[in-house]
């Protein structure tokens, strides 16, 4: 574990707070449920952002310290995927295993996750598969009309995916990720006052 820098990171438990932050172009780290294995982050150890912003890719490349040419991905509510992407015979893409062609609606509305060849590596999500992540995106859709979030793995270039809460905080503090979302139903075993004392963390309070 590398030394913490002492940069203040807000930890949010309320999904409405996170939706407001996304709408205001804030980068959010998501830490919940079991850890993730495999090549993709699927909403448990993810960094999310507003995909409507054309500069999203260049911004995230800077934040993650990774090569400019690598494509990014998105997570979309399953019930809306056919409005945005040519799925062909695919009914869903829960493991983010396929790059699919973007429809004109996607090119216009979510340019931040569309690669230069007009494809996107997309993850579909249902409430049954990941209730908290689905609920976050659904609330974002209800507020903005966009049923998609920019989704990339919660790590910096050349590093492993975060595992523990300390890993997540450390990654935030060594980057420009200033907000961490831990859903309200997730147990945090470290007392809040110790997080504040050790890592200079503030727990964001809902209005």
Over which residues does each language-model region extend?
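Flexible beta->alpha loop and helix N-cap segments adjacent to enzyme active/binding sites
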Residues: 1-207
């Amino acid at each position: 574990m590398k030394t913490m820098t002492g940069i203040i990171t807000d930890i949010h438990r309320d999904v409405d707070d996170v939706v407001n932050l996304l709408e205001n172009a804030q980068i959010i780290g998501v830490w919940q449920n079991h850890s993730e294995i495999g090549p993709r982050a699927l909403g448990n150890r993810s960094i999310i952002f507003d995909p409507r912003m054309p500069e999203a890719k260049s911004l995230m490349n800077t934040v993650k310290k990774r090569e400019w040419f690598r494509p990014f991905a998105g997570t979309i509510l399953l019930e809306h995927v056919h409005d945005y992407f040519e799925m062909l015979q695919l009914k869903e893409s829960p493991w983010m295993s396929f790059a699919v062609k973007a429809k004109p609606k996607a090119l216009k509305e979510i340019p931040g996750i569309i690669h230069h060849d007009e494809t996107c590596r997309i993850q579909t999500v249902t409430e049954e598969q990941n209730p908290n992540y689905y609920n976050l995106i659904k609330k974002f859709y209800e507020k903005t009309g966009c049923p998609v979030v920019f989704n990339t793995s919660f790590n910096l270039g050349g590093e492993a995916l975060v595992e523990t809460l300390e890993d997540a905080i450390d990654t935030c503090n060594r980057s420009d990720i200033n907000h961490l979302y831990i859903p309200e139903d997730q147990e945090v075993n470290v007392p809040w006052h110790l997080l504040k004392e050790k890592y200079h963390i503030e727990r964001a309070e809902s209005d």
